[in-house]
Every structure is written in structure tokens, then in C-alpha cells.
A protein has these predicted regions:
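Amphipathic, hydrophobic secondary-structure cores in small proteins
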Residues: 13, 17, 22, 29-49
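Short, Lys/Arg-enriched, disordered terminal segments
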Residues: 1-3
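C-terminal structural segments of small proteins and small subunits
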Residues: 48-74
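Generic non-transmembrane alpha-helical segments
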Residues: 19-22, 26-28, 56, 60-64
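Short, exposed beta-strand "edge-strand" segments with a Pro/Gly-rich flavor and a Y/T-containing core
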Residues: 5, 44, 72-74
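A short beta-strand micro-motif
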Residues: 7-10
Length: 74
């Protein structure tokens, strides 16, 4: 993954796994990683993606009603 990436923080592990599956079906380069130490979460994993795909990720999450805490640029 490129240096310019963002992460989606979720409330649950199941939401993170579902988001990963949906994003991969949409042909986006994503992966689940541990939540960075400087960010907090109820869930220990987050979805990493290229920052250029932020709008697409937000659309996928909204269309599929996947709840998330926040999106952070890293």
C-alpha cells in the first residue's frame, strides 16, 4: 500500500470484516490492520485503504449500512 493512506475505525470486528469484503468486491485495494496506537476504537482492527479512494469507501459503507466510528488520514 502507498504511503498516503487512510483507515476506517469500526465499532465492531464484524463490521470491519464486512467492509473489507465489500470493498474488495468493488475492486479496491484494502486490508485489515491493527488500529494505530494514536487512534482509539472499540474494535482492535481497522480497514486501511489508499486515501484517493476515500469517497468510494464512504459510498460503499453508506450504501451497505456499515456503521463506523471515523475515517482518519495517516
Amino acid at each position: 500500500m502507498k504511503d498516503n493512506y487512510s483507515v476506517v475505525i469500526f465499532y465492531s470486528t464484524s463490521a470491519a470484516i464486512r467492509a473489507e469484503s465489500l470493498a474488495k468486491r468493488g475492486k479496491l485495494a484494502v486490508k485489515l490492520i491493527p488500529v494505530p496506537r494514536n487512534l482509539s476504537s472499540d474494535c482492535g482492527i481497522c480497514l486501511q485503504f489508499n486515501s484517493a479512494d476515500k469517497q468510494k469507501i464512504e459510498e460503499i459503507l453508506k450504501e451497505n449500512k456499515v456503521e463506523y466510528e471515523n475515517i482518519y488520514g495517516i
